[in-house]
Amino acid sequence: MLLIKNGTIVNPAKHQHEVTNILVEDGKIKEIGQNVSAAGKEVEEIDAKGLFVTPGLIDMHVHLREPGQEAKEDIYTGTQAAAAGGVTHVATMANTKPVIDNAAVLRDVKHRIAETGVVKVSVIGSISKDLEGKQLSEMGDMAADGAVAFSDDGHYVESANFMRRAMEYADQLGKMVIDHAEDMTMCGHGFMNEGKVSYAMGVTGRPATGENIAVARDLLLSELTGCHIHIAHVSSGKAVDLIREAKAKGVNCSTEVTAQHLYFTDEWLKHYEAAFKMAPPLRTNEDRKALIEGLKDGTIDAIMTDHAPHCNEEKDVPFNCAPNGIAGLETSLASTLTVLYHQEGFTIDKIVELMSVNPAKLLGIEGGVLTEGVPADITLIDPDKEWTVHGQDLYTKSLFTPYEGLTLKGKAVMTIVDGEIVMKEGKVLK
């Protein structure tokens, strides 16, 4: 039994923002209120004075790499990293080896999660067999076994007709399709955003137009099929405009942005550091500002990480040879608080909405709310705690982080999953 006292409860789903107490018993929230007590019972008291007490953060886009790529990350280390970052639930993508394109692989992954997961994990099935965009995956069987959505993330579904069929099928199953929207005929040979910085560096670029074309196509297909399309990791200001216009027309669409695209721009790549290499790439400061405006007006629904760790030796190579992707679970909240809360004036309520409430709604999973009777998935946040990021101190297997040596402001100081403290003051306890 836990009694969280004197914390500021931030519970946007219930329009609640007040200093109060939470009693947790048998893995669930038993009571919330000023006069809550556990008289006569053995209870661990947590003094949360000066802290925000929020629904557990939910990251709807991570790559845990298991099975098949455990040298990069595995379910245990990836969920340890999640706990360290205040995340109580993640959704893992299908680009494992073998690909999660059938119910047998999905069940195997869920078994592994049950054995070693530190936080909760939902599984996203692939759209196509082996991520090749040619044959539909076993979407119906995977939906029956608990797949929360479908995505070939890391790969763009090139054929519009194939994507149409996939969306029609997913819509029948009541599932969302998540697309990595970059037209690879334009972007496939690029290493960073195409623009002034890439020209000065002499590096082949990935034009934002490639993203815009893909986003426009996906929105049109959603309008045609009625299927919920979720645009992964939007990075282009023009793409945000397209999504805003589609939402105004009633198209069934949503989108997300990574914390790193809100913090960094392509200017950070001037020293050819592979830690900043990702897809879609970091874009201009104008794009970054457009992403922030998209969050302000509700065009962008969620903040996530696209946690995509690689082996250290894979990243410690010349820039053009390094794979795309960074580890982000342990820095996402702090990066977001630094930029949005401390610099842009976002309320903590809005940030919790973007990092917990909305991801739960989009994935159709429990979470995003603090109320009596629900699982006690809770994050305690110190918004003013300053800390310096060092890759060697992180729980993820990937030591390369674009935040290396940077001081961020704000940090999760406790993570509770089903009433159990899994992280306290930066130390993961499982």
Regions found by a protein language model. Give the residues of each.
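Divalent metal-coordination and catalytic microenvironments
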Residues: 7, 22, 27, 50, ...
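C-terminal cap of metal-dependent C-N hydrolases
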Residues: 7, 318-321, 342, 375-430
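Metal-associated gating/positioning segment near the N- to mid-region
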Residues: 49-113
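Alpha-helix-loop-beta-strand connector modules within alpha/beta enzyme cores
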Residues: 54, 103-120, 168-179, 331, ...
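Active-site mouth loops of central-metabolism enzymes
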Residues: 60-73, 122-135, 204-208
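Histidine/acidic residue-rich metal-binding segments in metalloenzymes
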Residues: 134-303
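His/Asp/Glu-enriched, well-ordered alpha-helical/loop segment
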Residues: 200-228, 275, 296, 301-303, ...
